[in-house]
Structure formats: C-alpha cells, structure tokens
Curated annotation (Swiss-Prot):
A Pfam family of this chain: Pox_H7
UniProt KW keywords: Host cytoplasm, Host membrane, Late protein, Membrane, Transmembrane, Transmembrane helix
Segments passing through the bilayer: 10-32
Gene for this chain: OPG112
Induction notes from the record: Expressed in the late phase of the viral replicative cycle.
Family: Belongs to the orthopoxvirus OPG112 family.
Source species, domain of life: Viruses
Organism: Vaccinia virus (strain Ankara)
Upper classification of the organism: Viruses, Varidnaviria, Bamfordvirae, Nucleocytoviricota, Pokkesviricetes
Keyword Cytoplasm: no
Subcellular location: Host membrane; Host cytoplasm
Cellular-component GO terms for this entry: host cell cytoplasm; host cell membrane; membrane
Summary of the function given for this chain in its UniProt record: Contributes to the formation of crescents and immature virions (IV). Interacts with phosphatidylinositol-3-phosphate (PI3P) and phosphatidylinositol-4-phosphate (PI4P) lipids in order to form virion membranes. Mechanistically, mediates proper formation of OPG125-hexamers, and hence the honey comb lattice and spherical immature virus.
Protein's membrane topology: Single-pass membrane protein
Protein name: Late protein OPG112
Length: 146
C-alpha cells in the first residue's frame, strides 16, 4: 500500500502541528485497517524521543514531514521512560482503536474531514501546499489558508 495523498494533504494543511506519529498510526489503523510492520525508536532534530512506524514502503513520520533518526540499543537506556510511556500508548490504541478515536477530538475531526472533504478541495489544498513550500512560506500560514 502506498502512502495516502489525501491523508498527507490533511496532515500537512488543516492539521499541521496537531498530530504526532502515534496519531498517524491510529489514523492508519482506523481508516485503512492496517497495522505497522515495524516500530522504530527514534529522535527528532531536537533530540526528543519519538516512535516511528514503518509500513510497506513508507513511515508514519513521512505524513508529518518529520526527519527522525533511529537510536541505537545503548541510547534506548537514556530514553527508557519515554519508550515505556509511548509503548503503553501504542497498546492502548491497538486494544480498542474505535474507542481511542472517539475519545480523541482531533482524531475524530481528522476522520470526519478525511471522509467528508471532497477530492477537489483536498487537491486544491495540496496544490496550495506545493506552491507555498516552493516559495518558502511557513506551514502555519498554509494551515490558516486551508
């Protein structure tokens, strides 16, 4: 399965800055009924721990345009509490994805927009995103415009 363009467009426009890789995993499970093939312990450019989820030929972080660096086994000790916390969240999400979505307002809004927003409108938002990024315009401005 390829990365979904509608989902990427919504994540980068209307929901920019609101989602993380756990949210993306939950959305993929809910919308596409797919579980990740692999879990990757990573850090972002600021050194903050984050779990990334690998699917057939893409990662959850790609929906958010995040550049994550996998951590080594030795580095896992440094991030042990964050790893435990996020793995517990993953278990909660996987246990009952429907309930998790119902109790998370931003994910409910995302799914509603994903299902109800027309392809034309999402394509228009994607085009605005491409133009803005080519001109170096900030994501926050793009989010407000979509």
């Amino acid at each position: 399965m390829e990365m979904d363009k509608r989902m990427k467009s919504l994540a980068m426009t209307a929901f920019f800055g609101e989602l993380n890789t756990l949210d993306i995993m939950a959305l993929i499970m809910s919308i596409f009924k797919r579980h990740p093939n692999n879990t990757i312990f990573s850090v972002d450019k600021d050194g903050q721990f984050m779990i990334d989820f690998e699917y057939d030929n893409y990662k959850a972080s790609q929906y958010l345009d995040l550049t994550l660096t996998p951590i080594s086994g030795d580095e896992c000790k440094t991030h042990a509490s964050s790893i435990a916390e996020q793995l517990a969240c993953v278990d909660i999400i996987k246990e009952d994805i429907s309930e998790y979505i119902k109790t998370t307002p931003r994910l409910k809004r995302f799914i509603k927009k994903y299902r109800n927003r027309s392809d034309t409108r999402i394509s228009r938002d994607t085009e605005k995103l491409k133009i803005a990024l080519a001109k170096g315009i900030d994501y926050e401005y793009i989010k407000d415009a979509c």
